[in-house]
Amino acid sequence: MEKFDVLVVGAGTAGCLAAKTAAEKGLKVCIVESKKRAEIGVKICGDALGEHHLTYLGLEKPQGGELEKRIEGVQIFSPDQNTVFTIADKDFIGYILNRRLFGQWLLKKAANAGSALMDSTKFLEPLFEKGFVTGAKVRNSTGKTFELKSKVVVDASGFMAVVRHKLTGNMNIDREIENEDVEACYREIRQLRQENENTKYCEIYLDSKVTPGGYTWIFPKVGAKVNVGLGVVMRGKFPKPKKQFYNYIMARPQFESSLLLNAGAWWDPTRRPLDNMVGNGVVLVGDAASLVNPIHGGGIGPSMLSGFQAGKTIVEALEKGEPTQKALWGYNNLYMASYGKKQASLDIFRMLLIGSSDADLNYGMNCKLVTEDDVLKAAMGEDFHLNITETAKRVFRGRKRMGFLTKLRLTVKMMRQVGAHYDAYPTSPENFEPWRLQTMKLVEQGKKKLLD
């Protein structure tokens, strides 16, 4: 039976960063991946990555075609498309990736650091011993089933969270998430007849008739290619994403006679982070821990950040002794301080968007109750103030939209409350339960006041 210091389940962006970070410090690391090596990196997503994530992680810009298109920001279209917010800031400068090449680039970095890879190998179940996760049972492409022992197992298996779902209840890790916190997505890569005029910005379209609780995206790729897709919240009786895509998006003139290059569907956990992401001998990263921006659904940057922070924490824990939940707890603190606070606050803003009508959003954007600067500050996790003048109040009262105005004010207030709550994230598991109970209270308040 092979023994490792760290066993990473999943060779995605989070898994490769966790493996690379741990292996660079001399730990014996193995990545288990169900895909063939050549297919690592292939994933259904928007393929966008902010440049600041590479900078923060100390990664140079890859030069082998991994960065397919530079973008300068995001344009958000109101449901009636009469108002467009252009969000252009250094933190919104980024790239549309060649997803497979980028995944291969990260895998190579993990391998060069010393990580081993078992591709075409399926995770079956975690191994337990005396309250610790101590490895995994896996099956390779020949059908052989065997066990791998490790001091720490990292669940980097994405939305399916194959390790998390099989953990025991005494680890205080949520094994399931609500459907209403997930977006069902459908995406295509298409070759247009000619290149779009706007190739500097990623475009986001709000329209509850097309994408209830979600949005449509059109992201420019190299030449006349685009990444186009949509997501709908899995709340109640939600529509099928592919059907919505072909009924509404493909009806646009710009897609007439376009060529389908690639298509696929997947799920995106758009909510706050899991309240706790560590247990004895186990750490959760990336989509497996619901580490995705709740507003735009981007998860590549947060996943890489979490992988790096998890790897760093695992190294420190093993240097000091056993990888207990307490020893690994610092990963929770690192992520919550760097991105989790913002993510949780944006989850409240997501509730506002889901609970608002298209008419409310049209008026709100047109009247500049929420401005481009507000959206930018919210996206960066900064405080912002609503531009609610007496004139705006009269307009909304006259159009019988004071309810939306009230919701907007409440949203800003609750985002601040959630931010302050995450600033007080416990520094050890002993103080976790009271914090978790308060989290649940805030979330339920948000749902009751903004969604219902």
List PLM regions with ranges.
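Glycine-rich FAD pyrophosphate-binding loop
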Residues: L7, A23-K43
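N-terminal FAD cofactor-binding segment of flavoenzymes
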Residues: K36-Q75
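Glycine-rich phosphate/pyrophosphate-binding beta-alpha loops
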Residues: K43-G46, I93-I96, Y215, A289-G301
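FAD/FMN-dependent oxidoreductases across multiple families
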Residues: F123, G236-T313, L318-E319, Q325-S338, ...
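C-terminal helical "tail/cap" subdomain of flavin- and related membrane-associated enzymes
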Residues: V315-D452
